[in-house]
Regions:
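Hydrophobic helical h-region of N-terminal Sec-dependent signal peptides
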Residues: 11-14
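An extracellular/secretory-lumen and virion-surface interaction module
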Residues: 33-39, 43-46, 141, 152, ...
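Short, solvent-exposed, Trp/other aromatic-anchored flexible loops in extracytoplasmic proteins
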Residues: 88-155
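Short, surface-exposed binding/anchoring microloops in extracellular/periplasmic proteins
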Residues: 37-94
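C-terminal motif of bacterial Sec signal peptides marking the signal peptidase cleavage site
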Residues: 18-19
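Surface-exposed edge beta-strand/loop patches
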Residues: 27-29, 126-185
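Short, low-complexity, disordered segments immediately C-terminal to signal peptides
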Residues: 24-36
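Bacterial N-terminal signal peptides that target proteins for export
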Residues: 1-9
Length: 185
């Protein structure tokens, strides 16, 4: 009985140490590639009413964000842009999952995929998200965004702030075509 309690206390203490670990303050300059693609509404029964628009773009960083993410054992990476009192741009940022390493361009920038929706703040249901290109006309054209890394039960860290995004281009977004996997020869 005592042995079980001591194991529980040791594991709880270890979790608390991980949760209290100091996360360095980063300010990584990130630029967004000015091209967006539209992903058609998903086939989810609850969203059959109208679906929602899911956009993707590309972010470039001189520092390897994926290494910061792994080194400090973050659980999530958010891409957020407060918009107005009604909506916010919210999504995720990740390295290209089809590659072993992120793509490095000749100017030595790491390339990351950014997926995002435009929804009411903190709306996980996606039921009231922007679903029609006409709705974009009522939104501000330029946003200031940030990338946040965080842990489920711990601190989060803002990795980059004041990333400029021009959403006026979303009206001209192309339909997303998933990349074709190459067959091994």
């Amino acid at each position: 009985m005592l042995q079980g309690r001591s194991r529980y206390l040791v594991s709880t203490f270890a979790l608390l140490l991980i949760g209290c670990e100091k996360i360095p303050e980063y300010q990584v300059p990130i630029t967004l590639e000015p091209q967006y693609t539209f992903v058609a509404p998903q086939h989810i029964p609850e969203l059959d009413r109208h679906g929602y628009l899911l956009f993707n773009t590309t972010a470039f960083s001189q520092k390897p964000l994926h290494k910061i993410y792994d080194e400090y054992r973050f659980h999530y990476a958010h891409f957020k842009c407060p918009m107005n009192d009604k909506f916010e741009v919210s999504g995720s940022i990740a390295a290209d999952e089809l590659e072993d390493n992120p793509i490095i361009y000749e100017n030595h920038h790491f390339k990351y995929d950014v997926l995002f929706t435009i929804c009411p703040e903190n709306d996980a249901s996606k039921l009231e998200c922007i679903y029609d290109f006409k709705q974009l006309k009522a939104l501000p054209k330029a946003l200031s965004c940030r990338v946040i890394f965080g842990r489920m039960f711990g601190r989060s860290a803002v990795i980059s702030e004041n990333i400029k995004m021009d959403i006026s281009q979303l009206e001209h977004a192309k339909v997303y075509e998933p990349p074709q996997l190459k067959e091994n020869q």
